[in-house]
Curated annotation (Swiss-Prot):
This protein's encoding gene: rpl-11.1
Name used for this protein in its record: Large ribosomal subunit protein uL5A
GO CC terms of this entry: cytosolic large ribosomal subunit; nucleus
Subcellular localization: Nucleus; Cytoplasm
Biological-process GO terms, alphabetical: translation
Organism (species): Caenorhabditis briggsae
Length: 196
């Protein structure tokens, strides 16, 4: 290797700043059943099969008579996955969506989410005792150095240039997964009643 080749290699390494690279902090999976009981425990089994972790039950915040939900009643189940397992499950979920997401799926803080209609599309074998459930995927992205704002002792602030925004997340999604951003959904007109 000549000196010129070494220098160009060093420049390339410096050009890729490790602190600026986006990474998946966590993947949150959520199944909202809307009622407690047998259906909820079966939904918990689905999440346990998918993640290999014991999921957590979510309670209703307040009573909604029309839905038949009481306050503090367990109505949903969710699970947080991190590391390589999160990337693996996200890959399965995006494969179901054919790597196509809408711009509305991405938030201003650099996170994105989408839904899957049937859990059997993710590669889980169909069990008639469990049934079919849909689920929500929420992906939280961040950069190295976020701990500065989260730590207990001497917390600092992250500058605006280091925060993750919508455009960066979309670019990351397109580069990493060869994702396609679909045009916005056509807005349906709601029934407009005019006074006579």
């Amino acid at each position: 290797m000549t000196d010129i080749e070494k220098q160009t290699e060093i420049r390339e390494k410096k050009g890729r700043n490790v602190m600026r690279e986006l990474k998946i902090q966590k993947l949150c999976l959520n199944i909202c059943v809307g009622e407690s009981g047998d259906r909820l425990t079966r939904a918990a089994k689905v999440l346990e099969q998918l993640t290999g972790q014991t999921p957590v039950f979510s309670k209703a915040r307040y009573t909604v008579r029309t839905f038949g939900i009481r306050r503090n009643e367990k109505i949903a189940v969710h699970c947080t996955v991190r590391g390589p397992k999160a990337e693996e499950i996200l890959e399965k979920g995006l494969k179901v969506k054919e790597y196509e997401l809408y711009k509305e799926n991405f938030s201003d803080t650099g996170n994105f989410g989408f839904g899957v209609q049937e859990h059997i599309d993710l590669g889980i074998k169909y069990d008639p005792g469990i049934g079919i459930y849909g689920m929500d995927f929420y992906v939280v992205l961040n950069r190295n150095g976020v701990r500065v704002s989260k730590r207990r002792r001497a917390p600092g602030r992250i500058g605006p240039s280091h925060r993750v925004d919508k455009e960066e997340t979309i670019k990351w999604f397109q580069q990493k997964y060869d994702g396609i951003i679909l045009p916005p959904k056509p807005k349906t007109k709601k029934n407009v009643y005019r006074r006579r």
